[in-house]
Curated annotation (Swiss-Prot):
Residues 1-50 are annotated as: Disordered. Disulfide bonds: none annotated. The keyword Ribosomal protein applies. InterPro entries: Ribosomal_bL32, Ribosomal_bL32_bact, Ribosomal_zn-bd. Residues 1-26 have a biased composition (Basic residues). It comes from the Bacteria. The keyword Ion transport does not apply. One of its GO terms (molecular function) is structural constituent of ribosome. GO terms for cellular component: large ribosomal subunit. This is Large ribosomal subunit protein bL32. Keywords: Ribonucleoprotein, Ribosomal protein. Belongs to the bacterial ribosomal protein bL32 family.
Length: 50
């Protein structure tokens, strides 16, 4: 079992966590020309696009 040899300080762990950022998905253009978020159904046409 993996056990840390030394305690990791709060500052050090916080610095490491700064790189775990949430990336926002960019909108895509649907077949009818409207912009929507990916992996969602278009309410106008009912189409699903990645």
């Amino acid at each position: 079992m993996a056990v840390p040899k030394r305690r990791v300080s709060h500052t050090r762990s916080a610095k490491r966590r700064t790189h775990y950022k949430i990336t926002l998905k960019k909108p895509v253009k649907d077949s009818d020309g409207s912009w929507k978020m990916p992996h969602m159904v278009n309410p106008n046409t009912g189409e699903y696009k990645n």
